[in-house]
UniProtKB/Swiss-Prot annotation:
Complex and partners: Homodimer.
Binding, FAD: 18, 37, 45, 50, 90, 124, 285, 326
Cofactor(s) needed for function: FAD
Domain of life: Bacteria
Enzyme Commission number(s): 1.18.1.2
InterPro entries assigned to the protein according to its UniProt record, in alphabetical order: FAD/NAD-bd_sf, FAD/NAD-binding_dom, Fd--NADP_Rdtase_type_2, Ferredoxin-NADP_redctase_2
Gene Ontology MF terms: ferredoxin-NADP+ reductase activity; flavin adenine dinucleotide binding; NADP binding
Name of the protein in its database record: Ferredoxin--NADP reductase 2
Keyword terms of this UniProt record: FAD, Flavoprotein, NADP, Oxidoreductase
Length: 329
């Protein structure tokens, strides 16, 4: 039972673009809303993987930078001040005898009248740097995410990786850092050709094909030892910060154990965006139905459907069809 517990109207699992818009819309329906996100920042893959890439298929935007879209969604959502829980992964989800959902994460327990899952392709975690002692530098000056570029101003930054994320972060940091060095184990980068061209024409130091073999430092990383893949020549670089962009591993993980109808790694929903468990809804890339198309734009359309039906679920007196937003503010 959930007496004396703080029970939210809607708890959203996943803080990507669909989750952020779901939170805004839930607030607009005068619901108390909580977002639980496994990453240390909101924005999902847009923020973590390609913040500087342009998106061209969001209605009303001829083009919009991924991080700009996330920032706008966060600003829109702030109007209703939802509760945000970062670096929390939901491990179990169950409906109690009183109908309230109990969500247990790696940090705490949450209670909610309804749940909307907007987890994209599932919780995803970075591929970590597999060097002795690397873990002790995490949350110091070894980074897998960048939430504020300004903290790298006038610093010597090393970026590991050869894909879009690594090249994007190098280009973004190049104007503000004292020096940016990008390290890739292959001769050629996997990033978009235009981005690679910009990288070559920037003042960033490019070292290929090299791999890191040692991190030197006590409290923080002070030097990185690199080894040439072919000649095995070693180079030592002085650093202030290290950013690792080796990609991410995503998985539905514990979601598969919650009793939901899952087909081809997606949660099956009906026209209400409702799962096979009443009170649990899904929207965005994590869900599937006949004719489903996995696009951000589609997730934005599914979010209001999920919220309005969730509202009617936990408050049967509420109207399913809301007022138009132009009449509300």
């Amino acid at each position: 039972m959930t007496e004396n517990q703080n029970v939210y109207d809607i708890t959203i699992i996943g803080g990507g673009p669909t989750g952020l818009f779901t939170a805004f819309y839930g607030g607009m329906r005068q619901a108390s809303v909580k977002i639980i996100e496994s990453l240390p920042q909101l924005g999902g893959q847009l923020s973590a993987l390609y913040p500087e890439k342009y998106i061209y298929d969001v209605a009303g935007f001829p083009k919009v930078r991924a991080q700009e879209l996330v920032d706008n969604l966060k600003e829109q959502m702030k109007k209703f001040d939802p509760t945000i829980c970062l670096e929390e992964a939901v491990e179990t989800l169950e409906k109690q005898a009183d109908g309230v959902f109990k969500l247990v994460t790696n940090k705490q327990t949450h209670y909610s009248k309804s749940v909307i899952i907007t987890a994209g392709n599932g919780a995803f975690q970075p591929r970590r740097l597999e060097l002795d002692g690397a873990q002790k530098f995490e949350k110091k000056n070894l980074h897998y995410f960048v939430d504020d570029m300004n903290k790298f101003a006038r610093k010597r930054v090393v970026v590991f990786g050869g894909g879009d994320s690594a090249v994007d972060w190098t280009l973004m940091l190049e104007p503000i850092a004292e020096q940016v060095t990008i390290i890739h184990r292959r001769d050629k980068f996997r990033a978009h050709e235009h981005s690679v061209e910009n990288l070559i024409n920037s003042r960033a130091d490019i070292k290929t094909p090299y791999v890191p073999v040692e991190l030197i430092g006590e409290e923080q990383i002070e030097q990185v030892v690199l080894q040439h893949v072919k000649t095995e020549e070693k180079v030592v670089i002085d650093v202030d910060d290290v950013i690792v962009n080796y990609g991410f591993v995503s998985s539905l993980g514990p979601i598969k154990n919650w009793g939901l109808n899952i087909q081809k790694n997606s949660i099956v929903v009906n026209s209400k965006m409702e799962t096979n468990i009443p009170g649990i809804y899904a929207a965005g890339d994590v869900c599937t139905y006949e004719g489903k198309v996995k696009l951000i734009a589609c997730g934005f359309g599914e979010a209001p459907t999920a919220v309005n039906n969730a509202k009617a679920y936990f408050d049967p007196s509420a109207k399913l069809q809301p007022m138009h937003s132009s009449s509300m503010f």
